């Protein structure tokens, strides 16, 4: 953990946890072989399907200070044909320090209605269940 990620009390600033959750999610998708540009909008590109986060939560179990090592494990779970959530476990030196959760809803860009998850995300979720 770096100094810029702490608050005035010298412990983890709360918003950093959710940033790390999203970074771990993006990295997991990339390691699975899904290109970010196929899932996340970029300038000048219109996607047919969008995956907004509809819920997030964070629980802080122990303080994290500058210099603490940090490991993140994530567990995706399929909720229904149009939604999934990802649970995140944070540990430092083998002890649990935080947990997070993001819930994602697939919608069609054209009308903002629920839509089936993209095939790549479905494969990622299926592979996550099997491991």
Curated annotation (Swiss-Prot):
What is one GO biological process annotated to this record? phylloquinone biosynthetic process
Active-site residues annotated for this sequence: 7
- For whether the record's keyword set contains Hydrolase, the answer is yes
InterPro entries associated with the record: DHNA_CoA_hydrolase, HotDog_dom_sf
| Involved pathway(s) | Cofactor biosynthesis; phylloquinone biosynthesis; Quinol/quinone metabolism; 1,4-dihydroxy-2-naphthoate biosynthesis; 1,4-dihydroxy-2-naphthoate from chorismate: step 7/7
CDD domains xrefs = 4HBT
Q: Which UniProt keywords apply?
A: Hydrolase
The keyword Nucleotide-binding is assigned to this record: no
As for family, the record states: Belongs to the 4-hydroxybenzoyl-CoA thioesterase family. DHNA-CoA hydrolase subfamily.
Protein name (database record)? 1,4-dihydroxy-2-naphthoyl-CoA hydrolase
């Amino acid at each position: 953990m770096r100094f810029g990620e702490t608050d005035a009390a010298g412990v983890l600033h709360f918003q950093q946890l959710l940033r790390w959750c999203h970074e771990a999610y993006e990295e997991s998708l990339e390691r699975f072989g899904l290109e970010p540009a196929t899932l996340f909008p970029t300038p000048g590109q219109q996607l047919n399907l969008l995956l907004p986060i509809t819920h997030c939560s964070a629980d802080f179990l122990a303080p994290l200070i500058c210099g603490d090592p940090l490991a993140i494990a994530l567990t995706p779970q399929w909720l229904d044909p149009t939604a999934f959530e990802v649970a995140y476990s944070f540990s430092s030196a083998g002890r649990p320090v935080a947990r997070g959760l993001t819930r994602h809803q697939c919608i069609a860009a054209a009308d903002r209605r629920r839509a089936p998850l993209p095939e790549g995300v479905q494969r990622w979720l299926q592979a996550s269940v099997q491991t």
